Amino acid sequence: MLHHTTRYIIGILAICMMACSPNVPTLDKPTPMKKSTKRGVSFDFKKVEDLPLLSPAISWSYNWGNDQNSTAALWFDTNDVDFCPMCWNASYSESKIRQYVQEHPNTKYLLGFNEPNLTDQCNMTPAQAAEQWPRVVALTKELNLKLVSPAMNYGTLAGYHDPIKWFDEFFAQPNVSLDDIHAIAIHCYMASPTAMKNYIKMFEKYGKPIWMTEFCAWDPVPSNVEKQMDYMCSVLNHMEQNPNVERYAWFMPRTSGKVDSAPYMQLLTHGSPVELTPLGQIFTQFSSFDKSAYLPLEKGVGAHQYIALKNEDISLRVAENNQIYVFSFMPGQWFDYQVNIQQNQPLQIQYTTIVNTQLCVYVDGVAQAIVELPKTTDLQTVSTFTTTIIPPMGNHTIRIETLKGTFNFYQINNTTQH
């Protein structure tokens, strides 16, 4: 049997050897993309089936009311979704708002009047709204909520078609102070992404975060769902990356009309079982531009899971197998993907193209190779091209840039996937 002193010395030596040995490198682990803190919907969750379909992708919602049903409220509380009560007009119920906040103390915001410069909505002049505003401010202070301004659109109220004119007069009223307001709420239905982006800029003059609390392409009405998809992709790319936009809410997940009827903006199907529409799949899986995410390359990284891009005006589509892909990836465009690599294997690209297409692939900002993609049988049959590029293991940024031709881009992965 070893003497106690001998065992003690051996133990000390073992500790010293461990301390003095070279550090064994720890390989980075993949991290998922977090859901967007901005993304939300304007919708009354009446069907319980809708909740698990949308809640993984949204951080907030409102229904134009003072509260919401108990089933939705419980689901929101347990799935990190913020419900915002609203004072739609001057006839709101303080008691309902008060009770909801007391029962759900994580409530953070109160929304102001809805489209006061529209005669079929709240229908208030700036002076009329200002008369009622101190009550709203007092309620937010009592409940320790942040206040969001009245939600403005181009209007039908005589003399106040321009939302800026309405806001300027409202904020000039003696009962109103910008200091009481956390954010500016606006609505937009212009079908041009450029027009919408310029519209957002108009409201930056107030120096407050902007909440786009209703939007979709509706004026003019899009001719098909693909036009609505193109609009959605462009404006979500913009708002997710625009630091002045704090939140946005899609109008709306479901209406009483048919899913395949104009303006083609529904995210959820009717009937049973309820499912996401193709537009809903794009909305819920759209990039949150989470720079902390490194997705596992071995499992495949979807073309839609980029964290940076050149040109916000891209198009996403949904294949028959529900895979989301970039439609018509054109010369001059690029996408950046943050990936985690666990094995040294060649990079693969899944795609379709019927023209000669040339790409440049970068790893961590360094060009690795020019890739010539062979033509595929057609635009529906997906091909996998194995490159000669073997990215190092760990966390890296891969850029795919189109140099010539166009192609439909599905995903990147490596040869360990299938």
Language model region names:
Residues 1-9:
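Bacterial N-terminal signal peptides that target proteins for export
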Residues 17-35:
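Bacterial Sec-dependent N-terminal signal peptides
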Residues 37-110:
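N-terminal carbohydrate-binding/catalytic regions of secreted carbohydrate-active enzymes
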Residues 63, 85, 114, 164-220, ...:
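Aromatic- and acid-rich polysaccharide-binding/catalytic face
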Residues 82-84, 242, 251-300, 304:
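Aromatic-rich peripheral "rim/lid" segments of glycoside hydrolase catalytic domains that contact
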Residues 104-126, 147-158, 179-188, 212, ...:
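Active-site groove signature of glycoside hydrolases
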Residues 149, 154-159, 205-232, 250-269:
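Active-site clefts of carbohydrate-active enzymes
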Residues 291-418:
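Extracytoplasmic
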